[in-house]
Structure formats: structure tokens, C-alpha cells
Amino acid sequence: MQRQMKRDRREALILGAAGIAAATAGFLLGPVLLKSTGSGAMGEGTATGSAAMRAANLVDLSGRPRRLSEWLDRILVCNFWATWCAPCREEIPLLMAARQKYAPRGVEIVGIAIDNGSKVLEFTLSFNISYPILLAEADGLDLMRQLGNVSGGLPYTVVADRQGTLVHRKLGAFKGTDLDSILGPLAQG
């Protein structure tokens, strides 16, 4: 019996260490892997991501089914985030300001929460988030990967033009005028 307990404990320690190693590798290598797949401005090879955006089925905070294709006639900024993610929380005011500035010029910002619905609802009410929030929970990780986020890190943002073509992606929080440098030229065209 003691031998079985020792073996179970050893297996648990090995699995725990492997999980920590995998998470650390994803955190450290994620930006490198993302950069090698074209982080930032995008060129060829974005059709798969565009199709994934059009096909994405999510729900809003009231439980109503929503599709990202509802906004594909606009410049669409999809921001993947979670309530527990500090950089996600820090960039929310920038996203709200960008929506207020660029909405009249055909830009929509949609937050896609990789989190529990009740926590997201409470958070959005307390922060007075002014853009649409959709729930993806764990399914959002697969959508993020289809859109180029191989590490699964948050926050992660993709931008699609009015034709639904992915034109930009970013792993990590926006700072200062980052959004203006992306949305300004797109909103002029």
C-alpha cells in the first residue's frame, strides 16, 4: 500500500513538473513562435484565420448566440481576454477609447472572454465596458490558435478589414497609441 502511494505521489510530481515546464515553454517561446508566424502586420496566408472568424459561434452576456460575421462589414478588432489577466485589464481603457474614437469611421471592437460567464458579466458591469463582449470560455483557445496564437497567451488581438481579411494580430497588451497606428490608416480607406 505504501509503495502504491509513493508511486502515485511520484507520478503526480512528474505530471506537475511537466505541466509547469510546458506552461513556462509556452510563455517564453510564445512570442518567438508567434513572431515566426507573422505577428503584427500580416501578408499572405490569412485566409484560414478569416474563415475561422466568419465561422465562429459564440454567445453574448445574455446567452444569445452571436457570430463574428455580424461585424465583418466593419473593421473588426477581436480582443481575447480574461478577468484574471492583468495585462488584459490594463488595456481595456485603451480599447474603450479606440471604440469611441473609431466607431463613427466603421470600426467595431469585440471582446472575446476566455473565462467564466458570471465572472465576465460582473467584471464588465463594474468596469462599464462599452464594447460588445462575447463568451468563448475554453473553446476560445482553439479559435485563438486558428487565428495565429499558437501559445494561447492573453491578451491576444486580431484586426480584420472590411472584407474580413486579417490584417494585424498582436500577442500582449496594447500600449499608448498602438491602436491608433493600426486603426487610423484602416479607417481612412
Model-identified regions with their sequence ranges:
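N-terminal targeting signals for export/organelle localization
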Residues: 1-55
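Short loop/turn microsegments at loop-to-beta-strand junctions
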Residues: 53-54, 76, 154-155
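Conserved hydrophobic/aromatic "anchor" residues
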Residues: 56, 80-81, 123, 131
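Short, ordered coil/turn segments that flank beta-strands lining enzyme active or ligand-binding pockets
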Residues: 61, 71, 162
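Short active-site neighborhood of thiol/selenol oxidoreductases, capturing the structured segment around
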Residues: 68-85
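Structural microenvironment flanking redox-active thiols in thiol-disulfide oxidoreductases
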Residues: 89-128, 138-145
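Thiol/disulfide oxidoreductase modules built on the thioredoxin-like
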Residues: 126-129, 138-184
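Short acidic-hydrophobic, aromatic-tinged amphipathic segments that line or gate anion-handling sites
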Residues: 134-136
